[in-house]
Amino acid sequence: MTEPNKPLDQMTAQERLDLGISYLGESRFDKAIKALSSIRREEVNPETYAGAQLGLGVAYAESGELKQAIEAWSNIRRSDDSKIYAQAQLNLGAAYAKSGKREQSIEALSSIRREEAAPEIYTQAQLGLGLIYRDQDKPDQAIEAWSNIRREEADPETYAEAQFNLGVAYAESGKREQAIKTWSKVRHEDDPKVYALAQLGLGVAYHAQGEPEQAIKTWSNIRRSDDSKIYAEAQLNLGAAYHAQEDWEQAIEAWSNIHREEVDPETYARAQFNIGKIYEDKGDLERAKEAYCNAQDFFYYNYGRVKRILECPPKVIEKLHDIAKNTDEILKSLQIIPDFESRVAHYSRASTAFTLFGDDKNPSNFRLSTIRGVNDPTEGLVLRDYWEQQGISETIHTNDTATFVSCFTFNHDSLNQFRLYGKEDGREATGVSLVFKKEFFSDQPDTLGFIAGPSTDLSSKSEQNKSNETGKTEGDNKKQLIGKSTLYRCIYLDPETGYWTLAQRDKSTFYREHNEEADARGKWGKYYKSISTKEDDVETHLFNKGNNEEEDVETHLFNKGNNEEEDVETHLLNTGNNDNNSVSNENNKIKSISQILNSIFTDKNHPYNKCNKYEKQKILEAIRFILLPLQYLVKHIAFQEEQECRIMYITQFRDEKIHSDREKQWMYVEYEEPVLPHIDKIWLSPGAAKDQDFFRILLDQGSGKSKVRISQNPFRNKE
């Protein structure tokens, strides 16, 4: 430890400089500050003074006194010593950035010249400049800064980071070839972690270019020792690539390389879910159950489904599994069509919209309310009533869950929905229509995360970083939020006649959206074809009754023929083997849920009718759980005009995510995603038009086109 042999006032300036630097190396910052601050410009040469101020700034910074550090470094002039000046400017740039003063940081870093500074100082300055420009959403300037960094000048880590960042900037700018070229420059010996990130990006780029083999080769370059989390992400991608090639064994091997202790819980669960899905599709339910069990904290439905199926008598397991597979196919058909249904509307009170947007700077969370509060008394019961009409008297619907929904519609500016919903003080047409972008919802529809597992003691979870299922930490006194949910369209069914249709956009909306009639007609034609395909799939997997000659045809909502001039026609829906039916012969070989349930419960020779009471109960429990995702997606035909789609959360009443207020009769859960960033536009009913300017303040900041629209529907509110 350094100890001076004489007082500071008896030392030369050089001795005080040496002493201060020595104190700095020993982290004795107070003493370093005292020694270095005693050196005045007029008593020493410029280089010595610059060195003292550089060290003084470091001592202040290490002591947490950033303002004094900035003052010290600012005392150094380029004419004192160009290399020390460059180091000081680098430090200043970092200090300003830490203080949130980006423009001053840019000014400091930009003052460092390649020809005057040490190479590592110049390259670090360019790296920092690029990061600031990136954060300012100035990709061209960021690319220019990072492109200034040469391998021969920079240390390997700085060069690798610059090349990785460059690749990301190119990829985000749509310059995929340049991204590939740039990421390919990063070597493993430069920085293993950054190399792994570059290889991960390379694989994604190759995959996007339709080069799966090159993507697989690239992701395979990433080692667990490089970074366990990046390795896990690469293995997740590898598994998906192999799965797309139907190489099930390689996919399972890749996903099995992801270890629970090395990654975040959701990544591990996703890998195990994928493994379970392969085994389930192959009919290996025991191994599927094992994998799903590992994923149940995030993807409970599949685990619960397989578990219940395996608890049933072996002679009915295959049929129950067929019901499960049909359910999956139906849910795929109920998903939105991104190219045509990328925006959906939610009708609400204007006052509620203001709280969601955060006009008080503290936005509230979007809510899913209990199903018991909706205006449809048949919610969750329509399928039950339909099964009863088919002669199935057993109770195969569930009524002991806590179900929460939030409803959306393809009708963005609907007179009737303005009259029914979002009413202020009970007055019609006083609400607003919030039009959401598709990014508000989950883009991973295969996991059915909206069905939660049995409630656990969340007090134990709070000891584990108080994290919820989305990985988002909440305060001690806050309820957990539900993560992004998949948006599903509803099926509208008349349980007495069996007549049904899917929620969908109206033809008129295409003419509102597209000015040119030919464009609107073309888009409508493509959309109509997509919806027809979805309807055929739902018919095949849910409603098809098979070869009943007495019920050879049924009437459906509209004709799938080629006459576009007729808006509503009769669609002949074959329930047998008519080759002219739009449902293919191959699809007719598939036993629908209706057919399977009918055979189980109405055929006296079916194994179900030979089971004892306990076994029958297990079978009923399995069927109820399998069909649970569909129970609240089938609505009564009377509500068809609403063209509804919805997100759901189905859980137990003990779930601690549930908010309740008995006096106000409130029960709801809160959604994780903020509302304001996902709003495409807002339609104001006539009664809410007075709030137009207030909504514009919140929604139109920085945008050239207003997101706030006044409804064009004719309506006169009776006072």
Predicted regions located by residue number:
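Partner-binding and oligomerization surfaces adjacent to conserved cores of proteins
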Residues: 274-277, 281-283, 289-719
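Alpha-helical junction/boundary sensor with strong preference for TPR arrays
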Residues: 43-44, 80-81, 116-117, 153-154, ...
